[in-house]
């Protein structure tokens, strides 16, 4: 617990130094396992602001049907709804409907856990041509306490995700963006945890963004 408090104190002290450039994301990740089967449901909602709190940027809702092919491999077929507003006025809102397919591989190395996520997206964006996108993300979770990833355990969470566009349009570059994240997590229960972290998003020719992420991670089971 002392390690957690020290890390949270460090984040609280350093964030004001560049708070004017920070964006805020509030996220809920849920996974509902269906009885003793290999099927589960992924549910997710994200609220993204141009400021840490306030000036809405984007709302994302995602749901997916998952199937565990192997102990180390989960596949997903899902749908996402994304509502986006521009910075300032006018906010020029637009909607995106997104279908995605995903494969998630996991393995351990010592006490650390690693996940490799491959995702293919079909994007239907309002007033734009259809385009696809490929994403690869490497996650690593490293325990900080003897409890590991169980109740009252704390851990470091890092990931890096690359986005590549798939489009028949010379004006759309192949590189879309890259996200690098580092944070600290804590498990309130075996099936409920929270993470607080920082993410830098490189969006190519546009100015990169600094983001503070507060995320809740919840596993449920239908008996």
Predicted features and spans:
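Outer-membrane beta-barrel "beta-signal"
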Residues: 103, 209-223
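Bacterial Sec-dependent N-terminal signal peptides
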Residues: 1-24, 220-222
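Short loop/turn motifs that connect adjacent beta-strands in outer-membrane beta-barrel proteins
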Residues: 34-38, 72, 108-113, 144-154, ...
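Residues that define the transmembrane beta-barrel architecture of outer-membrane proteins
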Residues: 20-26, 57-59, 95-99, 130-134, ...
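Transmembrane beta-strands of outer-membrane beta-barrel pores
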Residues: 34, 45-51, 79-85, 107-111, ...
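Residue-level signature of outer-membrane beta-barrel architecture
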Residues: 32-34, 67, 105-107, 142-144, ...
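Transmembrane beta-strands of outer-membrane beta-barrel proteins
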Residues: 39-43, 75-77, 114-118, 136, ...
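Start-of-domain marker
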Residues: 20-78, 85
